[in-house]
From Swiss-Prot:
Gene3D superfamilies: alpha/beta hydrolase. Belongs to the AB hydrolase superfamily. MetX family. It catalyses: L-homoserine + acetyl-CoA = O-acetyl-L-homoserine + CoA. The gene is FUB5. GO terms for biological process: homoserine metabolic process; methionine biosynthetic process. This is Homoserine O-acetyltransferase FUB5. Residues 113-436 form the AB hydrolase-1 domain. Its EC number is 2.3.1.31. Signal peptide: none annotated. One of its GO terms (molecular function) is homoserine O-acetyltransferase activity. Fusaric acid is phytotoxic to plants such as cotton and banana. It has been shown to induce programmed cell death in plants. In addition to a mild toxicity to animals, fusaric acid exhibits acanthamoebicidal, antioomycete, and antimycobacterial activities. Coiled coil: none annotated. It comes from Gibberella moniliformis (strain M3125 / FGSC 7600) (Maize ear and stalk rot fungus). Residues 296-312 have a biased composition (Basic and acidic residues).
């Protein structure tokens, strides 16, 4: 088949509504079939690649039907609200913006018993996946009393608009990829507020979240106490520090250094896995403390397979965790250490490989860039202290002394400046990850605070 014939055949395939193929294209053109599409036509055999005069390769791949977002299957049960138009802080207007969410419990007749749970960097809307032991009857996230909801952030691969979703909700425009616009923590919260409006929510009883989720929680507070009654930011910051910005840049650099990254214009069939894995390894070291890793691995060389220990807690039997920071408390797995000298190396390699199977590099860059925009004072006040002083809600700040990423000192700053705040410590030497694994402490601290701040909800009968 000649070059001209090949191009004509491709054009017909793209334009013909009865023929559905997915195109994985290594330049600027990308097309993914919609969720409702099926492969009904006979697709002629195409060459694996053609080259234009500049030598840029374009690969075509016939595939079975798949959803617009190739990662959506990893969060079964999630629902989508579509916002027709949304203008980002940058001024960019997005259209047909999907917002993925999951909810538990019932919305009260007054629509005022909403508990927002905000996920961390690599999380999804499935709270049961990463804070499952806190969710359910009689627990902190009591589904008999609260309408518990978690909404996925912009840039995440798990359902909300991101580099792996269709541009403006239209698969014919291709997916965003590297063209996904810069978004902020405030963008997320404003978008999620629109989603709550669509659900008929009138008032938020509590907003709770850790790490990036804690940043969202602090931004929710600026809707005022008449809309958000109380907040719980955990292991977070009032602004992204130079320390955290530096770690994020090191991770992004690892991804961009992968030869397969191609300035973000890679296909789903051959992503920059090694760069993403290197970024994940770097991040994992910021999520744990030195003492935690030393206690767990030491200088164990494990010349034979050795079973990874669970640290002290177990996940629900039906849990398949994919979104915790370090995977510290997963079901035990065997490490094959034949190709490494130390257990710590096997741990990092295993976690990085697992992460690269369920995350996207452009999404990782988009989300870490989002963290760097976080600054409560931006556009509001001259100083962070002044911005924090504007928060009126009862506030429970949770900090971890061993956290080297978002330090206890940063939590103390928040608690000092917010007029109606108190600081409580999660006691652990596991570092930043403690907010995801010290479930019994979290449950006890949260229930106590909710009884103080929301007695009308906590003391009433189940809905």
């Amino acid at each position: 088949m000649s070059r001209r014939q090949t191009l004509k055949t491709l054009q017909k395939l793209i334009l013909a509504p009865s023929q559905h193929i997915s195109l994985s294209i290594a330049s600027n053109l990308s097309v993914i079939p919609s969720r409702s599409m099926t492969t009904t036509a006979t697709v002629p055999v195409l060459p694996t690649s053609i080259h234009d005069g500049l030598g840029k390769g374009i690969a075509y791949e016939k595939s079975l039907p798949r959803p617009v977002n190739p990662f959506s299957h990893r969060v079964p049960g999630r629902e989508i609200i579509t916002i027709p138009k949304f203008t980002l802080e940058s001024g960019v207007e997005m259209r047909n913006v999907p917002v993925a969410y999951m909810s538990w419990g019932k919305l009260s007749s007054k629509a005022n018993n909403v508990m927002i749970i905000c996920h961390a960097l690599s999380g999804s809307a499935d709270v049961s996946d990463w804070w499952g032991p806190l969710l359910g009857h009689g627990k902190a996230f009591d589904t008999d009393k609260f309408f518990v909801i978690c909404m996925n952030s912009l840039g995440s691969p798990y359902g909300t608009a991101s580099p792996v979703t269709a541009k403006n909700g239209d698969y014919s425009e291709g997916w965003y990829g590297a063209d996904f616009p810069s978004t902020t923590i405030r963008d997320d919260v404003r978008l999620h507020k629109l989603a709550l409006d669509k659900l008929g929510v009138r008032k938020v009883a509590a907003a709770i979240g850790g790490s990036m989720g804690g940043m969202h929680v602090l931004e929710w507070a600026f809707f005022g106490k008449d809309y958000v009654r109380c907040i719980v930011p955990a292991a977070t910051s009032s602004h992204q520090s130079a320390w955290a910005i530096g770690w994020g840049e090191a991770q992004r650099h690892a991804i961009r250094s992968d030869v397969k990254y191609k300035n973000g214009r890679y296909g789903f069939d051959d992503p920059p896995v090694l760069g993403l894995e290197a970024a994940r390894m770097t991040a994992l070291l910021t999520y744990r403390s030195r003492d935690s890793l030393e206690r767990r691995f030491g200088r164990d060389t494990g010349s034979k397979k050795k079973t990874q220990k669970q640290e002290s807690k177990t996940l629900p039997s039906n849990s398949t965790p994919i979104h915790s920071h370090s995977g510290a408390d997963e079901t035990p797995v065997a490490f094959d250490r034949a190709d490494s000298s130390f257990a710590a190396q096997s741990y990092l390699r295993y976690q990085a490989k697992k992460f690269s199977n369920r995350f996207d590099s452009n999404c990782y860059i988009a989300l870490t860039n989002k963290l760097d925009t976080h600054d409560l004072a931006r556009g509001r006040t001259r100083t962070i202290t002044e911005a924090l002083s504007l928060i009126e809600q009862p506030t429970l700040v949770l900090g971890i002394r061993s956290d080297g990423l978002y330090t206890l000192a940063e939590q103390e700053q928040i608690a000092r400046a917010v007029p109606n705040a108190k600081l409580r410590e999660i006691v652990s030497d596991d570092g930043h990850d403690a907010f995801l694994i010290e479930w019994s402490q979290l449950n006890w601290l949260l229930i106590g605070f909710l009884h103080e701040s929301l007695p009308d909800i906590m003391q009433r009968a189940a809905l």
